[in-house]
């Protein structure tokens, strides 16, 4: 029995190692042509279904990127364009794209020493949402790699994302995540804007890296 258990553990470790090695950043770079029209333009603003700057994803964790794309594909995140794109991707495509975007800012650690302290009102709201317990004290080091880095992300995107967790019965806007829905719903829109405005000012590892469609 002990030998069987040891074998199963070894096989599981091998499988996890293989999955990690299966992410190919070079392949992801070639597959990113469909992404750079929005995510490769600094400050690019979406106009449908809502108006906001598309998120910076260079430097975001690969497991989070995979999680987000999977949620779009399943319909847990509602966005017509992103769902269509995610539906066209295989699991391998997602892994490769995530690896490419994660490594684009490797070595560019956020300088947390320059982070401004939140105002008393914002500090109270962050405490109310218990935000740091998952996203990390500096909001750049989430406790789980499938959670996003928030520091320095565009305020209007963060606001739209949090507002989406409050949205029900809308075929084009909304996010289905029980934990985040429970956290976001007690906040007013004004409170969400205070929180996201502060998060956007923090030192960040996230960037938009301009890229050409022609490679």
Descriptions of predicted regions:
Residues 51, 62-116:
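Extracytoplasmic c-type cytochrome modules immediately beyond a signal peptide or single-pass transmembrane anchor
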Residues 87-110, 156, 183-213:
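C-terminal capping alpha-helices of c-type cytochrome domains
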Residues 23-45, 114-139, 154, 211-212:
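Sequence/structural segment immediately N-terminal to covalent heme-attachment motifs in c-type
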Residues 1-8:
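Bacterial N-terminal signal peptides that target proteins for export
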Residues 43-72, 83-88, 124, 132, ...:
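Gly/Gly-Pro-rich "capping" loops immediately C-terminal to redox-active cysteine motifs
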Residues 41, 85, 137, 176-179, ...:
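Residue-level hotspots at or immediately adjacent to binding/recognition sites across diverse folds
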